[in-house]
Every structure is written in structure tokens, then in C-alpha cells.
Design a protein with these regions (language model features):
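Helix-helix packing/entry segments at the starts of transmembrane helices
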Residues: 141-145, 211-224, 263-298
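Membrane-interface helix termini and inter-helical loops of multi-pass transporters
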Residues: 62-72, 99-101, 131-135, 177-178, ...
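Juxtamembrane helix-loop-helix junctions in multi-pass membrane proteins
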Residues: 56-84, 138, 200-225
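C-terminal-most transmembrane helix of multi-pass membrane proteins
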Residues: 3-4, 182, 187, 286-348
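C-terminal transmembrane-helix exit sites in multi-pass transporters
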Residues: 129, 146-166, 290-309
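Hydrophobic alpha-helical transmembrane segments of multi-pass membrane transport proteins
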Residues: 55-59, 63, 114-131, 193-204, ...
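Hydrophobic/aromatic residues within transmembrane alpha-helices
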Residues: 67, 75, 79, 114, ...
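Membrane-interface interhelical linkers
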Residues: 2-52, 85-113, 164, 212-213, ...
Length: 348
């Protein structure tokens, strides 16, 4: 996206072991219901929904750049508030208030989504700061390494044991970050904050499982964040000054539209997750950072010195290693399940 680039959301592990996104750029913001089984046939509508979601997350930098001279703090606050407004409208139109209120009255779910909201707020703030400060390529890096960071977090929080190949992938990624840090004479903080905030976001969202639909999840998260967003707007208004309503009608419409461009890819992602096997979702998740990378290099002409190319190539190698290992493991698990099913006694 996942968030999504831009987090996004869903929290099912794809081939890279990542949490599906709701949007930092992605994806990022809700669970998606029951996913298709690994051996389910490929759904053309599901494929269209998935590609549409990740493509929209991929081109988000261009949308945000159209909002100049709005700064990152005003933009993130506006995004939170207008996302909440749009979600409220969706709940009203789809008659989704009953299940939403049921979730909101559940203290565990509500608090968990509030904590997830804080993480996605950090993710959005970092992402938009990077985009508006000429660091689109580094934001793409954050979402490239997110699947590997998610695997890394699983070791510490879930006490998961990694296979040797997975450790190799993590090691290559660490080497990539070191190369990028040496080349840039500084740690790529934007990429690391994006990757870890979205990885932690996915971990927390797993705690509520598939009980929260996309719209209700985003509504609860943005509702928790709205007081913070209002305070942020007050501070911006008292210092730099607000731009909403001060530039042009087109600019104001685009700013209000941040709520729509946050929710629509998330809904596409939710629809895709219900129709496509997770292994396909895992591959398609790389559409967003690939598009962001291409936007940064070929449209915005961000610098790509040799050290940066080496760092990115190492990250891509790590992803190929991790994805290949996960696909092989998934196929092995599927064969074992099929063998167990075929050997089960038949009822008469």
C-alpha cells in the first residue's frame, strides 16, 4: 500500500511474510475478512482490485505533491479528519453502523485499533514528510524492506524461529541499509521508520484478526486520531498558517479528497483479499514501492548514486530470497495438506 506504501492494511502474511497494507502509502488500515485459500483459482476481479489498490498507493506521491504549499503536518491532520468524514459517509450509505458500534463498544478491539492508529499516524507523517522533502525513493525503500522487517519483528514479538534462508535475507537487508547509510553519510531514517511503524502496525492489527472490516477499522483508527489531528491543525494555524481555503478551489478539493484517496485503495485491497490467494497478494504488494521508486527516479529525478543502486539491489536480492523460500514452504505445506486429506478415511 499499507498501507500501504501507505500502509494498508490487512494483516495476512504474503510470500514475503509481510503484513498486507493499509497505507502509509499503503496500505494501511484494516483487516479484510476471510482471504481466499492458497489453492483457490485466480480471480480476474480480484486481480483488478489488487492491482488498482497498489497502483493508487504507488502514485500517491504525485497526488501529495499537487497539494503544495501545504506542509506535512497540515496535510496529515487533514487526511485524518477527511478520512473520518468519508468513512462516516460510507457507514451511513452502506448501513454499517450496527457492526461498527458493536466493535466500538468492545474495549479490547477499540483500544487495539487506537494503538494501531497511533502507529499509522507516525507512518503517514513520516511518509508525507519524505514525499514533500524530495525523498520519494527513500519512502519506496521503506516499503521494500517492510516484509523483511515484519519477519524480523516476528522473532522478537512472536518468538518465531526463522529458517536459515530467512536469516540470510535479513542479513542481506542489514547489509543494504549499511551500504545506503555509508553512501548517504547518514542512516536512512525515513525508510526505517516507515518499515518498522508499518510492521508494528501489522502485528497489532493481527490481534483483532478478521473481526474488523476495512471501513470500520479505518473509522475507529481515524476517530482516535482526530483529537490529535485537530491539535496539530491549531498549532500549524498559530505558527506557519493553514493553507486550506487559502490557495484555490482546486487545492481545497484536493485536500478534502485526501479522505477519498485514503479509503478507496483500502476498499479495493479488502475486495482483492477476499478473492485472491494470499500468495498472489504477497507478490502484488510490491507494485506500490516499485511505482514509487520509478516516480522518484524517472519523474522527480531524485539522485541515484552508485551506493544507492547497490543498496537497492541488495534489498531486491533479499526479497527474492525471502519470497522464493516462502513460496517453496507454502507449496510444501499445501502438498502435505492435500496428502493428509486424500489419506483421510471417507465417510459412508
Amino acid at each position: 500500500m499499507q498501507t500501504t506504501p501507505e500502509p494498508v492494511p490487512a494483516n495476512s502474511a504474503g510470500p514475503a511474510g509481510s503484513a498486507g497494507s493499509t497505507d502509509g502509502a499503503g496500505p494501511a488500515a484494516a483487516t479484510t475478512g476471510v482471504p481466499a485459500s492458497p489453492d483457490a483459482p485466480l480471480s480476474r476481479p480480484g486481480l483488478i482490485f489488487a492491482v488498482s489498490a497498489y497502483t493508487l498507493w504507488g502514485v500517491l506521491p504525485l497526488y501529495f505533491l499537487l497539494l503544495a504549499p501545504t506542509g506535512p503536518f497540515e496535510l496529515v491532520a487533514a487526511r485524518v479528519i477527511f478520512s473520518l468524514v468519508f468513512c462516516v459517509l460510507l457507514l451511513t450509505v452502506t448501513r454499517g453502523w450496527a457492526p461498527f458500534l458493536l466493535l466500538a463498544r468492545n474495549p479490547r478491539v477499540s483500544f487495539t485499533l487506537g494503538l494501531a492508529g497511533v502507529l499509522i499516524f507516525v507512518n503517514w507523517q513520516t511518509y508525507i514528510y519524505g514525499v514533500l522533502n524530495g525523498q520519494v525513493v527513500e519512502t519506496a525503500l521503506g516499503y521494500f524492506i517492510n516484509p523483511i522487517v515484519t519477519v524480523f519483528l516476528g522473532v522478537f514479538f512472536l518468538r518465531e524461529k526463522l529458517r536459515i534462508v530467512q536469516w540470510v535475507s535479513v542479513g542481506i537487508s542489514i547489509a543494504a541499509v549499511l551500504v545506503l547509510a555509508i553512501g548517504a553519510h547518514g542512516v536512512p531514517w525515513i525508510a526505517l521508520i516507515l518499515a518498522f511503524s508499518f510492521g508494528l502496525y501489522g502485528y497489532i492489527k493481527k490481534r483483532v484478526g478478521g473481526t474488523v472490516d476495512a471501513v470500520s477499522g479505518l473509522t475507529l483508527e481515524t476517530a482516535w486520531l482526530t483529537p490529535l489531528a485537530i491539535v496539530q491543525l491549531i498549532v500549524v494555524g498559530a505558527t506557519a498558517g493553514l493553507t486550506i481555503g487559502q490557495v484555490s478551489v482546486f487545492h481545497t478539493v484536493l485536500l478534502v479528497g485526501t479522505g477519498v484517496i485514503t479509503a478507496v485503495p483500502l476498499l479495493f485491497f479488502a475486495a482483492a483479499s477476499r478473492r485472491l490467494p494470499l500468495i498472489y497478494m504477497g507478490f502484488i504488494q510490491f507494485f506500490a514501492p516499485v511505482i514509487q521508486f520509478l516516480v522518484g527516479v524517472f519523474i522527480l529525478h531524485e539522485a541515484m548514486p552508485v551506493e544507492r543502486w547497490i543498496g537497492f539491489i541488495l534489498v531486491w536480492i533479499a526479497l527474492v530470497v525471502l519470497t522464493t523460500d516462502t513460496v517453496i514452504s507454502a507449496r510444501g505445506s499445501l502438498r502435505r495438506r492435500n496428502k493428509a486429506a486424500s489419506g483421510a478415511p471417507q465417510q459412508l
